Design a protein with these regions (language model features):
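Residues within the helices of the helix-turn-helix
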Residues: 12, 28, 58
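DNA major-groove recognition helix of helix-turn-helix/homeodomain DNA-binding modules
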Residues: 35, 53-70
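Short alpha-helical DNA-recognition segment
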Residues: 20-44, 73
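Interfacial/linker helices and their anchor residues that mediate assembly or domain coupling
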Residues: 76-121
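A short, Lys/Arg-rich alpha-helix, primarily the initiator
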Residues: 1-23
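Amphipathic alpha-helical "recognition" segments
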Residues: 38, 54, 71-84
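The DNA-recognition helices of helix-turn-helix-type DNA-binding domains
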Residues: 18, 48, 75-79
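DNA major-groove recognition helix of helix-turn-helix
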Residues: 15, 45, 56, 75
């Protein structure tokens, strides 16, 4: 497997950071709580193996108390919920994503706030 060094390094950094104050974040314990083997986790963190499936990444993010989308993006994966939304209207959503590409974070927040208001009208 090709692996994903950036994902592995970020995952290790987050886990090690938490391990300083909580032994539950040792490689073995974290792997067990994430639903994968310690060997697999070790190889992921070293960039030797590809990241696990999205559901495992989401579980890891929950344990690490980070935004799952951050880890999913690093792993080049999409949240299964978002996948379902995209399948509902693929052409419109593809057009929307291409249109907003390159917009500033502030503009994107304005757009999502506007969309949220429209949805609740």
């Amino acid at each position: 497997m090709a692996g994903n060094k950036e994902f592995g390094e970020r995952l290790r950094h987050l886990r090690e950071e938490r391990k300083r104050s909580n032994p539950a974040f040792s490689l073995r314990k974290f792997a067990q709580k994430s639903g994968i083997s310690a060997t697999f986790l070790s190889k992921i963190e070293r960039g030797e193996f590809d990241p696990p499936k999205a559901d495992k990444i989401i579980r890891m993010a929950e344990l690490l108390d980070v935004d799952p989308d951050e880890l999913l993006a690093l792993a080049d994966k999409v949240d299964p919920d978002l996948n379902e939304i995209i399948k509902e209207q693929p052409k419109v959503l593809s057009k929307l994503l291409r249109t907003v590409r390159g917009m500033s974070a502030d503009k994107l927040h304005e757009l999502t706030d506007w969309a949220h208001r429209q949805r609740n009208v």
